[in-house]
């Protein structure tokens, strides 16, 4: 591959780990694992993210497209309907989105974020 075509081989990437900020945690003990594949200049990021079960508040300042690879999650906008996400589902969250993310079954997604 060249520097113009980048594969998604996470076995060659050291993952970052984390969790929701304590003030955003609603339930459970969710743990995040993120394999950042691309951090291009100009504020575009892509990679693979995985989370274990739990529920927390989310507030988006950025634009994100993602594709669920495995698992089951529920994203609910404040005052809106629940969006049930399973393998194969895709979603875009725009800046200003506020709500909750609940991982029911460990979920893995690939993503592209524009800040």
What spans do the regions from the language model cover?
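A short, N-terminal "cap"/entry segment at the start of jelly-roll beta-barrel domains
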Residues: 1-43
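Conserved short histidine dyad/triad with adjacent acidic residue
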Residues: 42-60, 94-95
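Conserved hydrophobic/aromatic beta-strand scaffold that supports enzyme active sites
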Residues: 46-48, 65, 90
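Short, conserved beta-strand element in jelly-roll/cupin
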Residues: 51, 61-75
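Short hydrophobic/aromatic-rich beta-strand segments that constitute the beta-sheet cores
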Residues: 58, 75, 109-111
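Short acidic-glycine-tyrosine-enriched beta hairpin
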Residues: 79-95
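Ligand-binding loop in jelly-roll beta-barrel domains
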Residues: 95-115
């Amino acid at each position: 591959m060249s520097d113009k075509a980048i594969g998604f081989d996470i076995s060659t990437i050291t993952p970052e780990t984390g969790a929701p900020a304590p003030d955003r945690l609603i339930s459970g003990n969710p743990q995040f694992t993120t394999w950042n594949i691309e951090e291009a200049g100009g504020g575009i990021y892509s990679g693979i993210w995985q989370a274990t079960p739990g529920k927390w508040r989310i507030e988006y300042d950025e634009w994100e497209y993602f594709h669920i690879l495995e698992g089951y999650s529920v994203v609910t906008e404040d005052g809106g309907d629940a969006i049930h996400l399973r393998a194969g589902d895709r979603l875009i969250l725009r800046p200003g989105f506020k709500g909750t993310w609940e991982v029911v079954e460990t979920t893995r997604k690939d993503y592209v974020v524009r800040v």
